[in-house]
Amino acid sequence: MLFYYIQRTAKSIPQIKEIGSLVCQKWGQPLGNNLWGFPGWSKLSKVREEDFRKLKLGYRAKYVHDVAQVVGDDPFYFSNISQLSYDDAKSELIRLPGVGPKIADCALLFGANKTEAFPIDTWIAKVLDSHYGLESFTYSQKALFARKHFGLFCGFAQQFLFSGERLGLIKSK
């Protein structure tokens, strides 16, 4: 999951899917029916940064390469992350190259079952700003507000807010 989220700040979803498919085809295992598995960080740790760049990763190629160097030798890295508290897991992920608070929250919510993670993108920020008056709040302050307001499962609330905003179901004030 983290591989895809590292790209998220610079690419559209179709571009991310395309790059993911290219990476899987180039370094992953064939699964049949023209499908390929994700190669894993261990395999990606052997890929040169230039080879990532050739797949249209742009400046994110360095981050993917550097993360692969850090986690590629530890097959338990992400399972160990999921065993940590939310705060400790987030702190650990943010230490990785190219991983900031939003990417860490996405990886924790969708990849480590940390339901208290509340990723804030422009859609979520718009909802929080217009409905809760949080325009002057930082990312961390908005995320803390969400955890207190929506509780331990605020990550689920985030999904409803995101979908509602994207579908035009949430009326702006």
Language model feature labels by segment:
Residues 1-173:
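HhH-family (HhH-GPD) DNA N-glycosylase catalytic core used in base-excision repair
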